[in-house]
């Protein structure tokens, strides 16, 4: 569609100063960005879910309450600041944060997805990432009544300069294409 526009994509879960790093923009979950940046929503809100393979659930059982996760093999998420993410669950206004026991720790959800598909344990995911695997039966969701809805993807860029034409076109394209159906 735009043959003269070049895109350089770098994937990282770290909070990057896109201006200092020489990038025009960054994309992340939620709208929290450094104060000198502008955030624009790219997607609808995203539900976060816990998924496991049918083999794992047959072998170790299905958790019925968040406390049950303490007795399961869980795949932990390492955040960009190297902290281990505490799973945030919510039901009827009640919030529950839990540090799960991690047999495996990953810093990218896609890496954890490979482990979960292989039966290594349970993991907390953005629902659109696992939806195709749930649909075809390779994964099952657990504790679905505790699945919170959080802010979706946002693109962020410097508020100190005019929006480059290429970046404006990219934003429009992403909003039109709706990646992951969002």
Question: Where do the PLM segments sit?
Answer:
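Short beta-strand-to-loop elements that line the ligand-binding cleft
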Residues: 7-11, 76, 97-108
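Paired acidic/hydrophobic, glycine-rich loop segments that form the ligand-binding mouth/hinge
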Residues: 25-28, 121-125, 141-142
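Hydrophobic residues within well-ordered alpha-helices
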Residues: 69, 115-119, 134
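C-terminal effector-binding regulatory domain of bacterial HTH transcription factors
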Residues: 127-136, 140, 146-182
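Central regulatory/effector-binding core of bacterial HTH transcription factors
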Residues: 1-38
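Flexible hinge/capping segments at coil-to-helix
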Residues: 36-47, 52-77, 92
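Ligand-binding cleft/hinge of the Venus flytrap
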Residues: 68, 85-99, 133
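Short, hydrophobic alpha-helical packing/hinge segments within bilobed ligand-binding/sensory domains
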Residues: 14, 111-113, 130
């Amino acid at each position: 569609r735009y043959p003269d526009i070049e895109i350089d994509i770098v994937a990282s879960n770290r909070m990057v100063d896109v201006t200092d790093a020489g990038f025009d923009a960054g994309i992340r979950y939620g709208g929290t960005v450094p104060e000198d940046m502008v955030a624009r929503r790219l997607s609808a809100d995203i539900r976060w879910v816990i998924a496991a393979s049918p083999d794992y659930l047959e072998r170790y059982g299905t958790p019925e309450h968040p406390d049950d996760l303490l007795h399961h093999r869980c795949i932990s998420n390492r955040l960009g600041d190297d902290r281990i993410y505490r799973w945030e669950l919510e039901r009827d206004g009640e919030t529950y944060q839990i540090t799960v026991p991690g047999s495996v720790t990953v810093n990218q959800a896609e890496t954890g997805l490979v482990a979960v598909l292989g039966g290594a344990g349970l993991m907390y995911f953005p629902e659109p990432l696992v939806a195709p695997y749930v649909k075809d039966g390779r994964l099952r969701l657990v504790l679905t009544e505790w699945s919170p809805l959080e802010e979706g993807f946002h693109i962020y860029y410097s508020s100190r300069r005019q929006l480059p034409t290429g970046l404006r076109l990219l934003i429009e394209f992403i909003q039109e294409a709706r990646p992951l159906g969002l």
